[in-house]
Regions:
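Juxtamembrane inter-helical linkers in multi-pass membrane proteins
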Residues: 172-194, 265-278
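C-terminal transmembrane-bundle signature of multipass membrane proteins
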Residues: 200-293
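Alpha-helical transmembrane segments and their membrane-interface junctions
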Residues: 54-59, 130-156, 206-232
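N-terminal juxtamembrane cytosolic/stromal segments of multi-pass membrane proteins
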Residues: 1-43, 262-293
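Perimembrane loop-to-helix junctions flanking transmembrane segments
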Residues: 65-87
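Loop-to-transmembrane boundary segments
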Residues: 31-53, 188-212
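Membrane-water interface of transmembrane alpha-helices
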Residues: 9-17, 59-67, 95-110, 161-182, ...
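Alpha-helical transmembrane segments
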Residues: 80-95, 145-168
Length: 293
């Protein structure tokens, strides 16, 4: 009964006040900057963010296509690595292209005025999360291809397992902390899959990575390429796990912001009265002046 009641998005207004503070009324407090702004010109300036689509398209679609058609054109790493980047990009191309279109639509729609600050805050937070998702999927062909080229399939699988560990501590545990704050409860440690995964990675993660890298330089069991990678390829092989760590860290913090924005939106009438929010901030300067006439 208690488990059904205490849902992450099911807290009451009084309970939500434990995580929603008055700094949510400032761009710094929202942690999403101008994406929460009620000013038209601030939102219009965010159209410059669409320039990032040129980079994400180049890295996620154009580069893999070029390497798949002519893997010999790559100079920094081996031809086999270039071919692997191209193959991964081929399978992810529809997802990357869809993410670019979705992000573009969301940025353009962000220009239009929202009903009030609560709507803009929730929309802006979702927009930021979509940007992180776009960056994540657009860089996968490059980072996955470089990792497989450097360490091989076996080592990449080990890095995937470690990614699951990062999801556990940077996303799931963060959500549990927010839920515990909402209901003022102590987190109960249970032996779920996350605990088992954490214990496994702590005990055997380093050993597995070491053995899988050693396999890449010696026996090459289960590998497509039998050639040994160079020094630059070895260094690039850590790009996937490093980049995914940063993205998951950012995503975890943005999901916290999303939960706060959700409750601020859900109880917007109560929070407007609770924080004594003026018309100018709630509706924006232009609409507030129009309403005052």
């Amino acid at each position: 009964m208690m488990q059904t009641k205490n849902k992450l998005f099911g807290a009451s207004f009084e309970q939500s006040k434990r995580i929603v503070k008055d700094d949510i009324l400032t761009e710094e407090g929202t942690q999403i900057g101008s994406f929460s702004s009620m000013s038209f010109w601030n939102r219009a300036s965010l159209l410059l963010v669409l320039l990032a689509n040129i980079i994400t398209y180049g890295v996620g679609i154009h580069l893999p296509d070029s390497l798949r058609d002519a893997p010999e054109s790559i100079q920094v790493v081996s031809e086999s690595t270039g071919a692997q980047i191209g193959e991964v990009g081929f399978f992810l191309r529809p997802i990357i292209f869809g993410a670019i279109i979705l992000f573009t639509v969301l940025v353009v729609l962000n220009i239009f005025p929202k009903i009030n600050y609560a709507h803009q805050l929730l929309y802006g937070t979702i927009l930021m999360i979509s940007f992180i998702f776009l960056v994540a999927v657009a860089t996968l062909p490059l980072t996955v291809g470089l990792t497989i080229g450097a360490f091989g399939i076996v080592a990449f699988v080990v890095q995937l397992i470690f990614s699951g560990y990062l999801v556990k501590i940077l996303i799931i545990d963060v959500m549990k902390e927010v839920k515990a704050s909402l209901y003022n409860e102590k987190e109960i440690k249970s032996k779920d899959w996350g605990i088992l995964l954490i214990n496994f990675v702590k005990k055997y993660g380093g050993i597995l990575i070491g053995l899988s890298i050693l396999n890449r330089w010696t026996f090459n069991f289960g590998e497509f390429s039998k050639s040994n990678p160079g020094l630059m390829s070895f260094l690039f092989g850590w790009l996937y796990i490093g980049f995914i760590s940063l993205l998951l860290l950012a995503e975890g913090q943005l999901l916290k912001c999303l939960i706060k924005a959700f409750y601020f939106f859900k109880y917007r009438k109560e929070y407007r009265e609770y924080f004594n929010i003026k018309d100018e901030q709630w509706y924006g300067k232009f609409r507030a002046r129009f309403m005052s006439k």
